[in-house]
UniProtKB/Swiss-Prot annotation:
<keyword id="KW-0328">Glycosyltransferase</keyword>
<protein>
    <recommendedName>
        <fullName>Xanthine phosphoribosyltransferase</fullName>
        <ecNumber>2.4.2.22</ecNumber>
    </recommendedName>
</protein>
<dbReference type="InterPro" id="IPR000836">
    <property type="entry name" value="PRibTrfase_dom"/>
</dbReference>
<feature type="binding site">
    <location>
        <begin position="128"/>
        <end position="132"/>
    </location>
    <ligand>
        <name>5-phospho-alpha-D-ribose 1-diphosphate</name>
    </ligand>
</feature>
<keyword id="KW-0660">Purine salvage</keyword>
<dbReference type="GO" id="GO:0005737">
    <property type="term" value="C:cytoplasm"/>
</dbReference>
<dbReference type="InterPro" id="IPR010079">
    <property type="entry name" value="Xanthine_PRibTrfase"/>
</dbReference>
<feature type="binding site">
    <location>
        <position position="27"/>
    </location>
    <ligand>
        <name>xanthine</name>
    </ligand>
</feature>
<dbReference type="GO" id="GO:0000310">
    <property type="term" value="F:xanthine phosphoribosyltransferase activity"/>
</dbReference>
<feature type="binding site">
    <location>
        <position position="156"/>
    </location>
    <ligand>
        <name>xanthine</name>
    </ligand>
</feature>
<comment type="subunit">
    <text>Homodimer.</text>
</comment>
<dbReference type="InterPro" id="IPR050118">
    <property type="entry name" value="Pur/Pyrimidine_PRTase"/>
</dbReference>
<keyword id="KW-0963">Cytoplasm</keyword>
<comment type="pathway">
    <text>Purine metabolism; XMP biosynthesis via salvage pathway; XMP from xanthine: step 1/1.</text>
</comment>
<dbReference type="GO" id="GO:0006166">
    <property type="term" value="P:purine ribonucleoside salvage"/>
</dbReference>
<keyword id="KW-0808">Transferase</keyword>
<comment type="function">
    <text>Converts the preformed base xanthine, a product of nucleic acid breakdown, to xanthosine 5'-monophosphate (XMP), so it can be reused for RNA or DNA synthesis.</text>
</comment>
Amino acid sequence: MEALQQKIREEGIVLSDQVLKVDAFLNHQIDPALMQLIGDEFARLFADSGVTKIVTIEASGIAPAVMTGLKLGVPVIFARKHQSLTLTENLLTASVYSFTKQTENTVAISPRHLNSSDRVLVIDDFLANGKASQALISIIKQAGATVAGLGIVIEKSFQGGRAELDSQGYRVESLARVKSLEGGVVTFIE
């Protein structure tokens, strides 16, 4: 997606050969017009997939997920990272390791919102090692629902997440595929 690649070139900051900071438009400050374009593109890509729900992880996946849900006309569920007094009943949970934060979290979704008739689209801001995607897939499977596909805003293709998801037979659509961050320069797979 050219608009996204351009935004990454202009406002993304390469912190290391492994880390790309995009807090100017995606995961701290949000560019609503760009999020709308992202939602439109995911909706186009998954229009014929029979999606009934979208699942993401709080917080950075919420904006692109909501824009996609708006366009597809389906609800968005975000897996919570933190315990809530209102989120208590027999939760669907999975552990996820954050590459960027170097921490392990348990994410949870209420089983009231997912069931076996759902076809679920996973939306996330980044795909690196695939741990967040695998955690969401685990939760979807616990509910007996079907994974319709994964929509990734930015994929770090030089890490193993995409290959693992591909090998498991999941459809992955990434809007920007980063080949390398070497030398402080973002290189895309075209």
